[in-house]
Amino acid sequence: MEKVDVKESAVGREMRIRKQWNEQNIFEQSIQNREGAQSFVFYEGPPTANGLPHVGHALGRTIKDLVARYKTMAGYKVLRKAGWDTHGLPVELGVEKQLGISGKHEIEEYGIEPFIQKCKESVFTYEKQWREFTESIGYWVDMDDPYVTLKNPYIESVWHILGTIHEKGLLYKGHRVSPYCPSCQTSLSSHEVAQGYKTVKDLSATVKFKVKDSENEYFLGWTTTPWTLPANVALAVHPNMEYVKAKQESHVYIVAKERVQEVLKENYEVLSVHKGEELLNTSYTAPFPMKEVTNGYRVIAADFVTGDSGTGLVHIAPAYGEDDYRVVQSEGLSFLHVVDEKGEYTEAVPFLKGKFVKDCDVDIVRYLAKEGLLYHKEKYEHSYPHCWRCDSPLLYYAGESWLIRTTAIKDTFLQNNDSVTWYPDHMKHGRFGKFLENMVDWNISRNRYWGTPLNVWECESCDHQFAPKSIAELRKHSTKETPEDLELHKPYVDEVQVCCGKCGGTMNRTPEVIDVWFDSGSMPFAQYHYPFENKELFEEQFPADVIAEGIDQTRGWFYSLLAVSALYTGKVPYKRVLSLGHVLDEEGQKMSKSKGNALDPVDLVDKFGADALRWALLVDSAPWNAKRFSERTVLEAKSKFVDTLVNVYSFYVLYANLDEYNPKETYDVKLTKLDEWVLSRLHSTTKKVRTALDDYQFTNAAREIAALVDEVSNWYVRRSRNRFWESGMNAEKAAAYETLHEVLVTISKLIAPFTPFVAEDIHLNLEGSSVHLADYPVVNESLLQPKLEAEMDAVLQVVELGRSNRNQHSLKVKQPLAELVLLEHNENDMDWESYRDIVMDELNVKAFHVELDETKYTSYQLKLNFKTAGPKFGKNVNAVNGWLKQLSQEEVQNFVSTGRAVYEATPEGEVVVTGEDVLVEKVAKSGFSNTTNGQYTVMLDTNVTEELLQEGVAREFIRAVQEYRKQLNLPVNLRVDIILDTEEELQRTLTNHKDLLEENLLVKQFTFGHLTNEDDELSLGETKLRIKLSAAN
């Protein structure tokens, strides 16, 4: 075995392992070795390479890698194809910034073709950094053959899907109100909108709409979007709600009966009550009469009007509201559009022309006040949608879009979701299920440039539509020969014209590109160029057994995968979804570069190593919970887990090499109870870890492993050290080596999916082969000893209580004590005699015994709980307290047993004192200290005799010399001679314990003499001494 370099950094170790993986193609071998095995399928959600990875990506990649490695070691064939999401507005915006241009007009001036070329160049800006990050974190995924959404084969598969949807009559062109980003100048789909809501404070206005031909009657309408008022064409009421005409000062206001108090507040008189239907068709004067409307400015009925907020009357602007548009269409009213594609007012609103509408709320309100049409204004906090790409507030615009009729197969969506297992499970019928319940048709088209072109050609003459499902089909119907290397992007596909199969006219492609979420949602099919190639491979890799991404993908990739698959095949594309929570900063705030609280995962890997980062992300909390995260979290993972394991591994290799122990040879072994215990713990942990991993409970699995490693290090190895230090190779020493070897090799396999680098380092050195080509450990039931584990757990509890007891009384473990008494509070069949020596050695006591009668070592004190007793006993409270203090121990014990006592000396007669009135304190017998956990109480005799004190000094001396040996970097098995220069009293103490010193310090000769200032000095409490240490002859 190679010597373990304990000074090697985590990053150094990981770089060395990565080099070995690359040189020996371990990743490729891990897949090839499972050829012919059952497939386990997972899909890689494609990141964009025009932005750098963040800590959330580290979590996602860690989870996906863990699952893939575990399933591979469990016997499955797991293909891992990387992917890149390369289209969309983020790319366009980045290129615009790079070119110093802004908006569609300037893009077209620059030229579509050169702009598209720039987009292609920019999408892999950070590919090198992504590859390095992916490899450095240990995520095994095939980045040499990724699917790329901009490539022709991928787009052709997307076209096949869209062509099939069109063939089914589910893709249509419609006029409707859609969410629109004025900054990006394109519409968005409902699932995109759902990703960008923010809580904001906007100016709201209650507006006076003057009833036509009346002197002083007004409808009151309330709006949180005053900018839409210039486009008002109607007011809506609910026909079945009651409305009042109420006089306030010289005006009469019409408002919903249930809102009148909230709106008018005071000093009003209700004149009459009317059903909403009585108000229908009442005309009013437009508040902004700047553009003629032929049919409008009257009251209409709408079932979406409620009395929950506002005035019970809704201002209707059909160009900017979905409900508004629908009701105006059904009423046949006029349509008024006063905003351009940049979100700025047109000449229809002359005094605000060219201004961004969301900046004009104050201007609108001022205008209304000036015209005497403002009843009330106030700031209103509400949730408002913002663009998920550029963060601009969205507007709702009426216009033509291409839509997919998802609502037509809503039942399929819901049934497919019912078959999926969600982690966490509340997502299924909660956040995701409710989104499906309320979904609308998918707005698939985008009026942009860099994206998959929508493959619909329309006839100039007869409006016939043609949606080719392949390049070959497009070529077949093209009016002229198309290039062999036709690129499926704008402007190249726009140059292809098709002959109309219906009238023989010319067909041109509709100019839009598609929603990028449709691109990524098509990846199960398009990654293999299905159905044009790889049919068998596709069928083997569909559906996914699991997908895992951040919770923000609930209405993103999770939805688009489900939707595309349902529309195309009717089938569900995945069996399980792991919806990962956000990684937050220490204060629970979302990380962002602008706030300065973002952690760079690359920096964390460079500083602490990928194993530590992965472990920190996994052991902290379940991955679907939002987690507070910091550098300290990673540092703790490194020190408490990774470094602890490396120290155990280093210890084993060091002593095995010294003893020339070879695990492949056969030795006479005699397993101790400690060996049997650790093997049982190893296999019971294996059982729990496999169960947890099979149920995707990664944190539970990690915590089981962490507990095992801690016990191996701080209990098994520490309790076995003397066996490793013995000279020669007896049966018990061989058993210790054999046991620790099995423990380390098995742990390396258990942790391989979690911390792949340190796992590989251990397994490679101990077994000579890659752990990632090994099978995952299987429990050996014959080694399980639950009774032994329970007994050792009891011992560990007692030892922990003893240490806690010593800490509380400032008694170092090196200081021997006379006695430990164990009080058991629950009867069990624990054989404490078998563990006597362990407890005495661990807690450094000279005697140990178990006592069932705790009254021999403890007594109770009763104090009145004034918080509860004060109100109960009133003026008698002090008398009752005094009475409690003078009770005999027998009376106190009786109260503790029964929880009841009667005090009869009050003027009012007897008083009943119960358990809730009293604080019970357990007091140790004089000379003893006690610590309890409810199950056990540990009593320590704290009287330190002179003899015990001297032994404590000798043990402190041993500790100091052992530290000194470490500083000198002496081999652990080197026998030494020691010369000591110190005061006579310490000489006597050390001489009296010479055997103890020689046993623990590998001392051959121990003498006292005069040393010079050139020799080293040690501190032993207040005492200074000089020491000379040399190799023994």
Curated annotation (Swiss-Prot):
Any GO BP: isoleucyl-tRNA aminoacylation
Cofactors, names only: Zn(2+)
CDD domains per the UniProt record, alphabetical: Anticodon_Ia_Ile_ABEc, IleRS_core
Catalytic activity: tRNA(Ile) + L-isoleucine + ATP = L-isoleucyl-tRNA(Ile) + AMP + diphosphate
This enzyme's EC code(s): 6.1.1.5
Gene Ontology, cellular component aspect: cytoplasm
Motif 'KMSKS' region in this chain: 590-594
Enzyme class name: ligase
Domain of life: Bacteria
InterPro entries named in the record: aa-tRNA-synth_I_CS, aa-tRNA-synth_Ia, Anticodon_Ile_ABEc, Ile-tRNA-ligase, Ile-tRNA-ligase_type2, M/V/L/I-tRNA-synth_anticd-bd, Rossmann-like_a/b/a_fold, tRNAsynth_Ia_anticodon-bd
'HIGH' region, short sequence motif: residues: 47-57
Binding site for ATP: 593
Gene3D superfamilies according to UniProt: HUPs, Isoleucyl-tRNA Synthetase, Domain 1
Keyword check for Protein biosynthesis: yes
Keyword terms, alphabetized: Aminoacyl-tRNA synthetase, ATP-binding, Cytoplasm, Ligase, Metal-binding, Nucleotide-binding, Protein biosynthesis, Zinc
Localization terms from the record: Cytoplasm
GO MF terms, alphabetically ordered: aminoacyl-tRNA deacylase activity; ATP binding; isoleucine-tRNA ligase activity; tRNA binding; zinc ion binding
Record function comment: Catalyzes the attachment of isoleucine to tRNA(Ile). As IleRS can inadvertently accommodate and process structurally similar amino acids such as valine, to avoid such errors it has two additional distinct tRNA(Ile)-dependent editing activities. One activity is designated as 'pretransfer' editing and involves the hydrolysis of activated Val-AMP. The other activity is designated 'posttransfer' editing and involves deacylation of mischarged Val-tRNA(Ile).
Database matches in NCBIfam families: ileS
Record text on subunit structure and interactions: Monomer.
Protein family according to the UniProt entry: Belongs to the class-I aminoacyl-tRNA synthetase family. IleS type 2 subfamily.
UniProt-recorded name of the protein: Isoleucine--tRNA ligase 2
Species annotation: Bacillus cereus (strain ATCC 14579 / DSM 31 / CCUG 7414 / JCM 2152 / NBRC 15305 / NCIMB 9373 / NCTC 2599 / NRRL B-3711)
Gene: ileS2
